[in-house]
Design a protein with these regions (language model features):
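Short, surface-exposed secondary-structure junctions/capping segments
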Residues: 137-160, 485-503
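Structured, hydrophobic secondary-structure cores that serve as assembly/anchoring elements
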Residues: 1-85, 100-106, 112-119, 167, ...
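Intrinsic disorder/low-complexity signal
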Residues: 24, 122-125, 135, 146, ...
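Extended, Lys/Arg-rich, non-catalytic nucleic-acid recognition/anchoring regions
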Residues: 74-154
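Mixed-charge (acidic/basic) macromolecular-recognition segments
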Residues: 147-192
Length: 520
C-alpha cells in the first residue's frame, strides 16, 4: 500500500517516482526539511503519524542545475547536474590510469556528490573507465553519461580529452574539480507544474507506472497558496483511473462551521475517489523553532496507512478512529454537534482523544452529500471495492503470457472466483447470500479466440453494501496496451447486455453473443 506525494523539494531528481521508507530516506534523496517545500513538512507528518513508505515526485518551476567544468587543453568539457537546484554539490576527478600512453583520446572519470562544499562526506559516487572523445565509439563520453544519475554533458564535446585533475600546488593526480554555484532553485510551483504532462510523464503523470498506489496527496503550492481546483479535478480523475484515493487539504479559511458550509456549497470537487479531513493541524516547525499551522494531508495519509489495509479497514467490527498521535494538535476544536454537519458534507473530523463507540462516525468520501451510493460515500467500503478490482487486475496479468487465449479463460475464472470467495468468507459482500455475492465471466461470451491483437476480457461483479446492488467491471488485458483497461459496467438483466460507462459519460452497448450470458 503506497502513498504518493507530488510537490517541491530542496533537491533530487525531477519527475521521477522515488520510494522512501523513512524521513531519513527523504533527507538522503530530497534534502529534508526546507521552508519553501510544503511537501517536506507533509512527509515529516506522514512518518510521524505512522506512515511506512511513500512515493515522492519532485517538481520544480524554472530550476537550473549547477555546472562542472573540466579543462581540455584550451577547450572545456562542461557537465551539468541531472537534478536542478543550488543544493547539488558535485565534484569530478579525471585520470589516465591503465590507459595506453599513446592513446590521447581516452580517460577515466569519477563523479561524486558530497554533503556540502569542501566536505569529504560522499553521498553518491559514479566511476566511468575508458571514456573517449571519439563520437563513433560506444564509450563516447556524451553517450555513456546519458546513463549517469548525477551528470550529463552540456554542449559540444571538445576535440581534446579532459586534463588530469591535480591536487592544488602539486602534480599529484588525486584532485577534484568542484561544481560552480550557478544553480537555481526556481520559482514557487504552480498548478500547471503539479498537473504536468501525460506525454512527458511529468507532474502527476510521473506516477503513471507506479503500481499498488492507494493514496495521493498534493500539498499546498506554498505556505500561503493552496492547490487550485483545476489540479484537484485532474488529480481526482487520475485517482479514479488508477483506483486510488486523493487526500485533499481543507481550505485555510475554514475556521468555523458556517464558513465550511458556505464553502462546500460552491466547491467543484465531488468525488468518491477523494477524501477530506478537518481541521488543519498545529505542529512544531523545526526550522523556525516554533509551532505552525499546516495542511493535514500528510498526517491524514499517515494515520490512514497505520489503520490497516483496505480489507481489514472495511471488515473490522469497529472502524479505526482518525486519531492523531502525540506531538500534533488540531488548529481549533470541533464540537460534537458540528461533527454531524461536517459528516453530512463528506468532511471527516480529526481527533486527539478517543471517543466511545456510539459517538464514532464512519469516515466519508467527498461524494457524500452528492446523491452517492453508500459504497461511494463511505471510505472503508470505497477502499474495499478499489482493492478488490486492483487485486484482480494485477493478479490476472499472467493471462497474456499464455499462447492460446482460450486456454487461459478457465484458470482465470477459477482464480478470481477463489479470491472473491475468500473475501466473502472474511465477511465481504455480506448483503446477499453466498451464491449471489459475486459473478465472474471469462469465456467465449465476452472473448474472441485467436483475436489479433491478443486480448482477454474478464467480467467481474460483486455485491455492494446495499442489498440488491452490485459493483460490475470489465477488465481487459491486451498486448496492444501497456496497462489493463478497467471499465465500470451495468449488467442489464432483462436484455443480457453490458452497458459500458466511460469518463465522458457516453454509453456503448456491448452485446453478448448469447442472450442468456448474464443470468442472475
Amino acid at each position: 500500500m503506497l502513498t504518493a506525494f507530488v510537490g517541491r523539494c530542496l533537491r533530487g531528481p525531477l519527475n521521477q517516482p522515488i520510494l522512501v521508507r523513512s524521513f531519513a530516506d527523504f533527507q538522503r534523496y530530497f534534502g529534508g526539511l526546507w521552508q519553501p517545500s510544503t511537501l517536506s513538512y507533509a512527509l515529516e507528518h506522514f512518518f510521524e503519524q505512522g506512515g511506512q513508505q511513500a512515493i515522492v515526485v519532485r517538481i520544480a518551476n524554472g530550476a537550473r542545475p549547477v555546472s562542472l567544468t573540466l579543462n581540455c587543453g584550451r577547450e572545456r568539457l562542461i557537465l551539468e547536474a541531472r537534478a536542478p537546484g543550488t543544493r547539488e554539490f558535485l565534484r569530478a576527478a579525471v585520470d589516465y590510469d591503465q590507459i595506453d600512453a599513446l592513446d590521447t583520446r581516452r580517460f577515466n572519470l569519477v563523479i561524486q556528490r558530497v554533503r556540502a562544499p569542501g566536505s569529504e562526506w560522499i553521498e553518491e559516487q559514479e566511476t566511468f573507465r575508458g571514456l573517449t572523445i571519439d563520437a563513433d565509439s560506444a564509450r563516447f563520453v556524451a553517450t555513456v553519461l546519458e546513463d549517469s544519475a548525477l551528470v550529463r554533458v552540456h554542449g559540444e564535446v571538445p576535440a581534446a580529452r579532459p586534463d588530469r585533475t591535480l591536487m592544488p600546488g602539486t602534480n599529484l593526480p588525486v584532485g577534484y574539480v568542484s561544481s560552480s554555484p550557478d544553480g537555481d532553485d526556481g520559482r514557487p510551483i504552480s498548478d500547471y507544474d503539479v498537473i504536468g504532462s501525460a506525454v512527458r510523464r511529468s507532474g502527476l503523470f510521473a506516477l503513471a507506472e507506479v503500481d499498488e498506489l492507494a493514496f495521493l496527496h498534493v500539498p499546498p503550492l506554498t505556505r500561503t497558496a493552496e492547490v487550485g481546483i483545476s489540479t484537484l479535478l485532474v488529480a481526482a480523475r487520475f485517482c479514479r483511473e488508477r483506483r486510488a484515493m486523493l487526500i485533499v487539504d481543507p481550505p485555510a479559511n475554514w475556521m468555523g462551521t458556517k464558513d465550511m458550509a458556505r464553502a462546500l456549497k460552491h466547491i467543484e470537487l465531488r468525488s468518491d475517489n477523494a477524501v477530506m479531513f478537518h481541521p488543519r493541524v498545529t505542529a512544531m516547525d523545526r526550522l523556525r523553532g516554533r509551532l505552525e499551522t499546516f495542511g493535514n494531508g500528510g498526517a491524514v495519509a499517515g494515520l490512514l496507512s497505520r489503520s490497516g489495509d483496505a480489507v481489514s479497514a472495511a471488515l473490522t467490527s469497529q472502524e479505526p478512529e482518525p486519531l492523531l498521535r502525540a506531538g500534533m494538535k488540531l488548529s481549533h476544536e470541533i464540537d460534537d454537534a458540528d461533527r454531524w454537519l461536517f459528516a453530512a458534507h463528506g468532511v471527516n473530523v480529526l481527533q486527539t482523544v478517543r471517543r466511545v463507540p456510539r459517538e464514532r462516525l464512519p469516515l466519508r468520501t467527498l461524494a457524500c452529500g452528492a446523491s452517492a451510493s453508500p459504497d461511494g460515500s463511505y471510505l472503508a467500503q470505497r477502499r474495499l471495492a478499489l482493492f478488490t478490482i486492483n487485486a484482480i487486475e494485477r493478479g490476472t496479468r499472467w493471462c497474456l503470457s499464455v499462447q492460446d487465449d482460450a486456454s487461459a479463460w478457465g484458470p482465470v475464472t477459477r482464480q478470481v472466483r477463489t479470491f472473491l470467495g475468500e473475501l466473502r468468507g472474511a465477511g465481504a459482500f455480506a448483503s446477499v447470500p453466498f451464491d449471489q455475492s459475486f459473478l465472474v465471466i471469462c469465456d467465449d461470451r465476452i472473448n474472441v479466440a485467436g483475436r489479433t491483437p491478443r486480448e482477454v476480457n474478464i467480467l467481474v461483479q460483486f455485491a455492494a453494501t446495499r442489498p440488491g446492488e452490485y459493483h460490475s467491471f470489465m477488465i481487459t488485458h491486451s498486448v496492444a496496451h501497456r496497462a489493463a483497461r478497467v471499465r465500470p459496467v451495468l449488467v442489464n438483466r432483462l436484455e443480457a447486455s453490458l452497458i459500458v460507462t466511460h469518463q465522458l459519460e457516453h454509453e456503448v452497448t456491448i452485446r453478448l453473443r448469447r442472450m442468456d450470458a448474464v443470468n442472475l
